[in-house]
UniProtKB/Swiss-Prot annotation:
Molecular-function GO terms, alphabetical: 6,7-dimethyl-8-ribityllumazine synthase activity
Subunit structure: Forms an icosahedral capsid composed of 60 subunits, arranged as a dodecamer of pentamers.
Pathway: Cofactor biosynthesis; riboflavin biosynthesis; riboflavin from 2-hydroxy-3-oxobutyl phosphate and 5-amino-6-(D-ribitylamino)uracil: step 1/2
Residues the record lists as binding 5-amino-6-(D-ribitylamino)uracil: F14, V46, F47, D48, C70, V71, I72, L103
Protein name: 6,7-dimethyl-8-ribityllumazine synthase
HAMAP family in the cross-refs: Lumazine_synth (MF_00178)
Main function: Catalyzes the formation of 6,7-dimethyl-8-ribityllumazine by condensation of 5-amino-6-(D-ribitylamino)uracil with 3,4-dihydroxy-2-butanone 4-phosphate. This is the penultimate step in the biosynthesis of riboflavin.
Organism in which the protein naturally occurs: Methanocaldococcus jannaschii (strain ATCC 43067 / DSM 2661 / JAL-1 / JCM 10045 / NBRC 100440) (Methanococcus jannaschii)
Gene this protein is translated from: ribH
Class of enzymatic activity (EC top level): transferase
Catalytic residues, chain numbering: H78 (proton donor)
The protein's Enzyme Commission number: 2.5.1.78
Amino acid sequence: MVLMVNLGFVIAEFNRDITYMMEKVAEEHAEFLGATVKYKIVVPGVFDMPLAVKKLLEKDDVDAVVTIGCVIEGETEHDEIVVHNAARKIADLALQYDKPVTLGISGPGMTRLQAQERVDYGKRAVEAAVKMVKRLKALEE
């Protein structure tokens, strides 16, 4: 029996030129893996992701959530604060809802050029989400 995996995407619009490319690569890889992207929520930035992740995790037809974002280094340590806090809360939500949430977030501490070179983080996050859903389902059998 083939397991269908339903995904929700949470995408940051900050640095949208990069997150758009990440989103497209992630969508293509989901299709390649036979997964369905059921929902997409675009949020202002990475720091805003946890609430949208929570809303998707509450849906019965979502097996996993993929986060897609890009945090570029600025003059202060703001990029580190944003990524570390968002990642911690996103991990907490995965445990709270007992569903995988994967980090397709590049940064902190990178330049725009480095961010463009890391567009495949979206693909990696989809790969991890699908693998986690399948492996966790196998544990239940």
